[in-house]
Design a protein with these regions (language model features):
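Pyridoxal 5′-phosphate
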Residues: 2-418
Length: 418
């Protein structure tokens, strides 16, 4: 089925001004409209046809925001129109029912339960909500890494100024020898005053995946809670939040789940919900109800609705198949560059320590100059990283990326390295 007919088929779904939440769900599902494709090569060709891409450069920077595939985008536009037609009727009658439905679908995707999942606007909101709402006392200690995301580190700095919390900062090696090396690094900073550890599931600047379950087991043995930054994980690779055994987890869904901008996930272990103060006050008096943590007032509800379509699209591909593809794309270019003179791959070589994101630098060129040269001379878009012992460009291809495009990237880096 070609792209035009595929989108046309999706557009044939019925639409009426006022329908029930259950009818809305049925009529706005992708589940019955995506073609069954068993051949892997044909699948990825079909997937690429679902994206409208600029032809004046190669996009290897999907890590910030993941372009929405057209089948999902088509449904997102339908949601916008539907909510616009119903207006206040939708907000008063169907908003909460649909949000509960989408939350249930999201919980299933990440291997948890709806009573532990809240829809937010991004990972920053999810994690900063926990950091700012944690019951800190003066002299409490928190642990995080130099490689963690900036806005969360800034929130820890703010609670240090506000409550007198002591922040202890470690540096995660780019090429750890074992899980135990990472676990011991965090454990070395724990004292009797340590209350919370923040740790990346995947470090956003290098793509390194950390041994979260082992870190949580270690921390809990000391009575310390763990908050996980999984901004790049939901929709990229297969995992279960419940299996990680963490206390808190945050992710951005507009990254690798490819929802519209402004969708995130917050997980709070049901035994910890009562202790976190909401970002904004609300009327929910039950402190064990996670819904009290994601009250943000009126917001673009059609974005929340499109989460369901993004889940449908991911399930059509298959999360394990997507994980395999993402890891293949990253290893395709990184393995070709690892033993090249003047080239430094900042992502672990161990196949289990990374997935789709990688980082590569040049000893003869600064990261900013490297990114500029890649774009200006070779028409390849990346992002420069030059902090926390990481010097290079983050390379984040997508499921629409071809090996021909990665060959052009590898060739460009080799030429720049000489």
């Amino acid at each position: 089925m070609d792209k035009r007919n595929f989108i046309k088929t999706l557009g044939a779904l019925s639409f009426s001004p006022i329908i029930s939440a259950s009818e809305f769900s049925k009529n706005h599902s992708l589940s019955n409209n995506l073609p069954k494709i068993d051949n892997v090569d044909e699948l990825w060709k079909t997937v690429r046809s679902h994206y409208t891409l600029k032809d004046d450069y190669i996009n290897l920077e999907s890590g910030y925001y993941n372009i929405i595939p057209e089948p999902v985008l088509d449904h997102f536009i339908k949601h916008v129109k539907h909510v616009n037609v119903e207006g206040s009727y939708y907000m008063r009658n169907d908003l909460n029912k649909n949000k509960q439905r989408v939350t249930k679908e999201l919980a299933k995707l990440v291997g948890s339960t709806p009573d532990q999942i809240a829809i937010t606007r991004n990972a920053t909101e999810s994690l900063d909500l926990v950091i700012s709402g944690f019951p800190w006392q003066k002299g409490d200690e928190a642990i995080y890494a130099k490689q963690d995301y900036g806005t969360m580190k800034e929130m820890f700095e703010q609670i240090s100024d506000r409550y007198g919390v002591i922040n202890k900062i470690i540096s995660v090696p780019n090429h750890p020898k074992s899980d135990e090396e990472i676990v011991s690094l965090y454990e070395s900073q724990i004292t009797k005053k340590t209350k919370l550890i923040m740790v990346c599931h995947m470090i956003n600047i290098t793509g390194q995946i950390l041994p979260i379950k082992k870190i949580c087991e270690m921390a809990h043995s000391h009575g310390v809670e763990v908050m996980v930054d999984g901004a790049h994980c939901v929709g990229m690779f297969d995992f279960s939040i419940d299996d990680l055994n963490c206390d808190y987890y945050g992710s951005s869904l507009h990254k690798w789940l490819a929802t519209p901008l402004g969708a995130g996930l917050l997980y709070v272990n049901k035994n910890k919900t009562h202790k976190i103060w909401p970002l904004l006050a609300n009327g929910i008096t039950d402190k064990t109800d996670i819904r009290r943590l994601n009250h943000i007032g009126t917001h673009p509800v059609h974005t929340d609705l499109a989460i369901s379509n993004s889940i449908d699209y991911l399930n059509w591909i298959g999360i394990k198949r997507k994980e395999e593809r993402m890891r293949f794309l990253q290893r395709y270019w990184s393995d070709k560059l690892r033993n090249t003179n003047n080239v430094v791959v900042n992502t672990p070589e161990d196949i289990n320590r990374s997935c789709g994101i990688g980082n590569v630098g040049l000893t003869n060129m600064s990261p900013s100059e490297m990114a500029k040269t890649l774009m200006d001379k070779y028409k390849i878009f990346t992002v420069a990283i030059d902090y926390a012992n990481v010097k290079g460009c983050r390379i984040s291809p997508n499921i629409f990326t071809t090996t021909d495009e990665l060959d052009r990237f590898v060739d460009a880096v080799k030429k720049m390295a000489t």
